[in-house]
């Protein structure tokens, strides 16, 4: 799911009418769900780039059929290792440094919850929010997210660029962190 969420950051460079997923299969409902997430998460991108005729019906086609013998065949990975269930009980709070995460941390503290903060690419505001909440460093999960340099170079050359559904990236990556931590 995280890869599917990150996909749109790269798709927006060319707005290809077809997306071909080779890492597994997706059913029709799943394809429709991803298409809906991408389309509705790209409103600012469409506006900034003057894309006025965008309609979900002709937005993109997603193909996701795993070839015979490939990983993810029919969504099954019989030899895949199972991730351990989280060893730390409590609540994982994504922290972006704004009022939403600050209020959430404060309310959970008052409720006596075991709190873990989750930060993507820590910076001043996120670190200050965690500090203000009184969380120790061992209660903070920090991850680094980088974008491909080729994509950034294409953006510099004038290829399409703009906002993508970052909240979805936070949601899916925090689920992975919660499961593994």
At which residue positions do the language-model features occur?
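RNA-binding accessory domains that recognize and position tRNA/RNA substrates
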Residues: 1-90, 102, 107-147, 159, ...
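Conserved adenosine/adenylate-binding substructure
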Residues: 153-181
């Amino acid at each position: 799911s995280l890869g599917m969420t990150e996909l749109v950051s790269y798709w927006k460079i060319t707005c290809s009418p077809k997306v071909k997923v080779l890492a597994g299969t997706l059913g029709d409902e799943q394809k429709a769900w991803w298409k809906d997430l991408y389309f509705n998460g790209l409103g600012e991108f469409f506006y900034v780039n003057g894309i006025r005729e965008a309609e979900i019906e002709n937005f993109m086609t997603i193909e996701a059929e795993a070839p015979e013998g490939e990983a993810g065949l029919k969504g099954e990975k019989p030899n895949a290792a199972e991730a351990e269930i989280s060893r730390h009980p409590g609540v994982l709070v994504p922290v972006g440094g704004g009022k939403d995460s600050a209020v959430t941390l404060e309310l959970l503290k008052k409720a006596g919850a075991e709190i873990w903060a989750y930060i993507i690419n820590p910076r001043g505001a996120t670190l200050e929010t965690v500090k203000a909440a009184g969380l120790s460093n061992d209660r903070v999960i920090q991850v680094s997210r980088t974008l491909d340099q080729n994509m950034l170079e294409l953006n510099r050359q004038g290829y399409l660029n703009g906002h993508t559904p970052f909240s979805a990236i936070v949601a899916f990556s925090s689920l992975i962190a919660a499961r593994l931590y």
